[in-house]
Swiss-Prot record:
It comes from the Eukaryota. Belongs to the peptidase C48 family. The keyword Hydrolase applies. The active site is at 109, 126, 174 (nucleophile). GO terms for biological process: protein desumoylation; proteolysis. Its EC number is 3.4.22.-. It is an enzyme of class 3 (hydrolase). This is Probable sentrin-specific protease 8. Residues 12-185 are annotated as: Protease. Protease that catalyzes two essential functions in the nedd8 pathway: processing of full-length nedd8 to its mature form and deconjugation of nedd8 from targeted proteins.
Length: 243
């Protein structure tokens, strides 16, 4: 059965099967997650909201690939130069609970891990009560070279902060929650960058991302109706690009 290409955008590709997912109440796959992250990197529709250079959005495929790389040294060799990981102040990791290298795009749940360099810790958002927390620890074990004093594996939980997260009301919107949290946090980062007249070094990412204001904002903005609209918004964005 054919699955025609609808849109090719930067390093992402959207097929008809992805459109079908967005049109129905289905779990978002890695293709849709990757597309929207690329869209956010480019600053959205008007290309004005570009993220600071100190912030990195990793694609699901990179995170998935690193899950099966044996050593941190190999990950550094593969990704340090092209992505400049150690120069970034904030790194977003979209996670699934797929541990099977033979199943591309598999898993049953998305969650979000964020490394904050100035904090020297990772923060974690999960729309189903830390369902993927063991996967977060697993990914930290692969990227603990980012920490200023890399700990032994037994102490990794000390470097993870579970954040209160808006909770999904069904079994399929987790990916939309991840994208929505990323987008709302990026809006705050971009605004803070503008307030500092583009001087990125003046931004306190630790204070910004861990503030009570930020957490309250996420709960205020990311409601079930917001999530429902976000699914439609992503679909419409793709269809506009198709034209």
């Amino acid at each position: 059965m054919s699955d025609p290409l609808i849109v090719s955008y930067n390093d992402s590709a959207i097929y008809q099967s992805d459109i079908n997912i967005l049109k129905s109440n289905q779990w978002l796959n890695d293709s849709i997650i990757s597309f929207y992250l690329e869209w956010l990197k480019d600053g959205g529709e008007d290309n004005k909201n570009k993220i600071p250079n100190q912030v990195l959005l990793l694609s699901p495929s990179v995170v998935f690939c690193c899950s099966f790389v044996e050593s941190e040294q190999e990950i550094q060799l593969m990704f340090e130069q092209p992505l400049s990981l150690k120069t970034k102040e904030v790194i977003f990791f979209p996670l699934t609970n797929n541990r099977d290298p033979n199943v591309i795009g598999g898993g049953t749940h998305w969650s979000l891990l964020i490394f904050i360099k100035s904090l020297n810790k990772f923060i974690y958002y999960d729309s189903i009560n830390s369902f993927n927390s063991s996967d977060a620890i697993f990914i930290i074990s692969k990227f603990k070279f980012l920490l200023s004093s890399p700990p032994p594996k037994t102490n990794l939980k000390e470097f993870l902060i579970n954040q209160k997260t808006p909770q999904q009301q069904n079994g399929y919107d987790c990916g939309l929650y991840v994208l929505s949290i990323i987008e709302e946090l990026l809006k705050l980062i971009i605004k803070e960058n503008e307030n500092n007249k583009g001087e990125e070094n003046k931004i306190s990412y630790k204070d910004l991302l861990l503030s009570e204001f930020t957490n309250e904002l996420l709960f205020k903005e990311i409601t079930p109706n917001y999530i429902k609209d976000k699914r439609v918004e992503i679909l419409n964005t793709i269809l506009k690009l198709k034209k």
